[in-house]
């Protein structure tokens, strides 16, 4: 599934790329005309900089931003807070811990610490922009913003795509060979990767990391199975019935005839949703937008800011619509067909997906519990499988 990417570049990313190339050129010239001792000093300095911690949360710093060494997360949080002139409220005593594991729990205390350690508001306001470039706040991703700019939409989609930890083309060629029936272990391995990919993707897309941690948990606990189905379709996951039943352990714990019939119906429905998505030949950008539409749902229980979540879903839907209109002008019904496929994903039984793919991996531990633990830990979950090379 190919995607035309040349027309979908974030202008700010292009500017950054030009700056990076210029910097690389300067560094190359310096290396050519400097003595070896200078090269060694530069290497030592670079190694030391790699270990600089974010002064806000203690995570690994990506460089100096707005006057202080910070990670990408705190840099983005501070920039958004200042540019939108946001005000937050602390639900505790205005002294919440702000570290790598708790930085998303209280935005008030996080911004307070950003300012306390010396991050400068004025550095955000005068952030560099190319000549004749509209103010980035014009494309600020806030409720009630301007949604008509292609730059805004292409930038949003680019960030969704960049958040993918495992591109579909790298899901293991040994598992994707047509005509070969996957073994039980391969099925469980691929399923673990698909679920891991969904959670890691969510943690790295715009806006989701800035939500209250309780909202993050609620959204993923409700939608993980829908994201799994989308990833299964995108990766062309083979869904042969026999190994699926074996992976589910039905032979070890026999079911009654009625339960077997119901279980098979759920499997067939799951297979149908995957096949219908594959038949539409959905490309990577469309899958990313579809996953964002699914993830940002106001149907999750206990959300702290439902209008904000609804706004994020609307943005994702607008981005998908504009992308389809631009990339598939000869398919006027394509956007509608894609959108109509999403409600059925909610009807795929999450308990059946657990039984089919994860009971051998995690036993009786609910997937929702694993997702919660992964988000609360703030670090990658250690699946018992090697990462894709």
Swiss-Prot record:
Residues 19-39 are annotated as: Disordered. GO terms for cellular component: nucleus. Residues 152-378 form the NR LBD domain. Expressed the retina, where expression is restricted to the outer nuclear layer. Pfam families: Hormone_recep, zf-C4. It comes from the Eukaryota. Transmembrane segments: none annotated. A zinc finger (NR C4-type) spans 54-74, 90-109. Gene3D superfamilies: Erythroid Transcription Factor GATA-1, subunit A, Retinoid X Receptor. GO terms for biological process: angioblast cell migration; brain segmentation; cell differentiation; cranial skeletal system development; negative regulation of transcription by RNA polymerase II; nervous system development; vasculature development; venous blood vessel development. Residues 51-126 bind DNA. PROSITE patterns: NR_LBD (PS51843), NUCLEAR_REC_DBD_1 (PS00031), NUCLEAR_REC_DBD_2 (PS51030). InterPro entries: NHR-like_dom_sf, Nucl_hrmn_rcpt_lig-bd, Nuclear_hormone_rcpt_NR2, Nuclear_hrmn_rcpt, Znf_hrmn_rcpt, Znf_NHR/GATA. SMART domains: HOLI (SM00430), ZnF_C4 (SM00399). GO terms for molecular function: nuclear receptor activity; RNA polymerase II cis-regulatory region sequence-specific DNA binding; zinc ion binding. It is found in: Nucleus. Keywords: DNA-binding, Metal-binding, Nucleus, Receptor, Transcription, Transcription regulation, Zinc, Zinc-finger. Putative transcription factor that is required in photoreceptor cells precursors during eye development. This is Nuclear receptor subfamily 2 group F member 1-B. It comes from Danio rerio.
């Amino acid at each position: 599934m190919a995607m035309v990417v040349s027309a979908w570049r974030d202008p700010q990313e292009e500017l950054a790329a030009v700056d990076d190339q210029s910097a690389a050129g300067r560094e190359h010239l310096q290396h050519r005309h400097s003595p070896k001792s200078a090269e060694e000093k530069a290497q030592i300095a670079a190694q030391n900089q790699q270990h600089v911690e974010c002064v806000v949360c203690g995570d690994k710093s990506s460089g100096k931003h707005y006057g202080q060494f910070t990670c990408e997360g705190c840099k983005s949080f501070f920039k958004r807070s200042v540019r939108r002139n946001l005000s937050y409220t602390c639900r505790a005593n205005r002294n919440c811990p702000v570290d790598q594991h708790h930085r998303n729990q209280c935005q008030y205390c996080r911004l307070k610490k950003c300012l306390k350690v010396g991050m400068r508001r004025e550095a955000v306001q005068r952030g560099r922009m190319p000549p004749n470039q509209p103010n980035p706040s014009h494309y600020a991703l806030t409720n009630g913003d301007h949604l008509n700019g292609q730059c805004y939409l292409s930038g949003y989609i680019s960030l969704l795509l960049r958040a993918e930890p495992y591109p579909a083309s790298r899901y293991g060629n040994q598992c994707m060979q047509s005509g070969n029936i996957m073994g039980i272990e391969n099925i469980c391995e691929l399923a673990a990767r698909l679920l891991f990919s969904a959670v890691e993707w969510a943690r790295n897309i715009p806006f989701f990391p800035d939500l209250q941690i309780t909202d993050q948990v609620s959204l993923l606990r409700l939608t993980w199975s829908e994201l799994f189905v989308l990833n299964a379709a995108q990766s062309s996951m083979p869904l042969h019935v026999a190994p699926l039943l074996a992976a589910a352990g039905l032979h070890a714990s026999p079911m009654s005839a009625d339960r077997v019939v119901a279980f098979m119906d759920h499997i067939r429905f799951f297979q149908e949703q995957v096949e219908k998505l594959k038949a539409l030949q959905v490309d990577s950008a469309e899958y990313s937008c579809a996953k964002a539409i699914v993830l940002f749902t106001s149907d999750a229980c206990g959300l702290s800011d439902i209008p904000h979540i609804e706004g994020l879903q609307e943005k994702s839907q607008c981005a998908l619509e504009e992308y389809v209109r631009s990339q598939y002008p000869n398919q006027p019904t394509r956007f509608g067909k894609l959108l109509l496929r999403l409600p059925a994903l909610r009807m795929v039984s999450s308990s059946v997906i657990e039984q089919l793919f994860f009971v051998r991996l995690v036993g009786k531990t609910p997937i929702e519990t694993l997702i919660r633990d992964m988000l609360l830990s703030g670090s990658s979950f250690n699946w018992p499988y090697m990462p894709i090379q």
